[in-house]
């Protein structure tokens, strides 16, 4: 009779443990889904900011070209750099799906680090070029 109680208690403990493991797996998968959704939202926001930045740079380049008409060699070089930056930004938009496929095996932190490194690598030179272009134009006007 004691043996039956031992078997029954062992069975209850095993089933409780199995339920807790199953619940842990479900909560882990739910957490992964939430992290993936938040990462997609972040990518969407980043894509929107990049598109706004691209359109602003394109408008700025067109405005400079219309306002000044003829360009000096220095202005031409600055405009070429701005156009190269715009092309780099365009390539970022198209490579997002490819990079998403490449990074499926990485964990979420590694993915976030990859995108922030890419953004820093592109935004630094963009801001430098824009500030140099605006500074040069202000000097010419002033």
From Swiss-Prot:
**Protein's GO biological process:** defense response to bacterium; defense response to fungus; killing of cells of another organism
User: Where does this protein come from, organism-wise?
Assistant: Bombina maxima (Giant fire-bellied toad)
Spell out which residues are annotated as carrying Phenylalanine amide.
68
Q: Could you tell me what this protein is called? A: Maximins y/Hw
According to its UniProt entry, what is the function of this protein? Answer: Maximin-y shows antimicrobial activity against bacteria and against the fungus C.albicans. It has little hemolytic activity.
Q: Which residues form the propeptide?
A: 19-43, 72-121
Which body tissues produce this protein? Expressed by the skin glands.
Keyword list, A-Z: Amidation, Amphibian defense peptide, Antibiotic, Antimicrobial, Cleavage on pair of basic residues, Cytolysis, Fungicide, Hemolysis, Secreted, Signal
Q: Name one GO cellular component term.
A: extracellular region
| InterPro entries registered for this protein in UniProt | Bombinin
Family as reported in the entry's similarity comment = Belongs to the bombinin family.
Q: Where in the cell is it found?
A: Secreted
- Kindly indicate where the leader peptide sits in this chain: 1-18
Highest taxon of source: Eukaryota
* Pfam families per UniProt: Bombinin (PF05298)
Residue numbers bearing the Isoleucine amide modification: 141
**What coarse category fits the chief subcellular location reported for this protein?**
secreted
């Amino acid at each position: 009779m004691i043996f039956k109680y031992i078997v029954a208690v062992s069975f209850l403990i095993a089933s409780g443990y199995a339920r807790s493991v199953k619940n842990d797996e479900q909560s882990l998968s739910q957490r992964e889904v939430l992290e993936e959704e938040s990462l997609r939202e972040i990518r969407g926001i980043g894509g929107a900011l990049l598109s706004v930045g691209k359109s602003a740079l394109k408008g700025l380049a067109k405005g400079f070209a219309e306002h000044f008409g003829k360009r000096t060699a220095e202005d031409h070089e600055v405009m070429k750099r701005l156009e190269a930056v715009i092309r780099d930004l365009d390539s970022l938009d198209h490579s997002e799906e490819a990079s998403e496929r490449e990074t499926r095996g990485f964990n979420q932190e590694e993915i976030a680090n990859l995108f922030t490194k890419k953004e820093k690598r592109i935004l630094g030179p963009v801001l430098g070029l824009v500030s140099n272009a605006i500074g040069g134009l202000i000097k010419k006007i002033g």
